[in-house]
Amino acid sequence: MTHLLSRLACATVLVVASTCALAQPAELEGVKLEQTTQVSAAPLVLNGAGLRTRAFFKVYVAALYVPKKATDAATLLSQTGPRRVAITMLRDVDAATFAGALNDGLKDNHSEAQLAGLKPQIDALNAAFKQVGEAKKGDIIQLDFAPDVGTRVVVNGQQRGSAMAGDAFFSALLRIWIGDKPADGGLKKGLLGG
């Protein structure tokens, strides 16, 4: 009986400890990542986060927030409802370079026909980043999607440009990081919760 009680006590301690650990923000490269957030009042959970590197430089930490966690790209891409990619800059990058990298990621993961169908949204994305000027170290760029609004670019709490309509466009953006040809394989693994 004493053995059973001590096992139950240990199990209780483990459950409480793991619950407390889940409630704490995660941290990557000094960037605190909340376990939950909201877009358009809809609750989202942190699916995963990772580091984007270019050559030997640490460029940004990206975090993916979704309605329901998943570990494979296809499931994440098929989810509907509000979602967020939160990017915290680790170095200064001019907006043209940042937008160019996003455009390259779109081209790498979509056919010419698919890109042609997304041209108005891609143009709006480029215009939004043109308003940003330079993304500075510590800036937080959120790509927020809500079905009734579309995709918004929010930099340090301020929307830039106009919203880009369509669930398909947000999924296209996600493919930059979790598609078949991701911008960074390690980042993809992190966003998938790996």
Where in the sequence are the language-model features?
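N-terminal signal peptide c-region/cleavage motif recognized by signal peptidases
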Residues: 18-21
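Mid-length scaffold segments of soluble, non-membrane domains
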Residues: 70-148
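Short, solvent-exposed mixed-charge patches
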Residues: 193-194
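Short strand-turn-strand beta-turns centered on an Asx-Gly dipeptide
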Residues: 155-159
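Bacterial N-terminal signal peptides that target proteins for export
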Residues: 1-10
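Short aromatic-centered micro-motifs
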Residues: 37, 152-154
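N-terminal secretory signal peptides
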Residues: 24-79
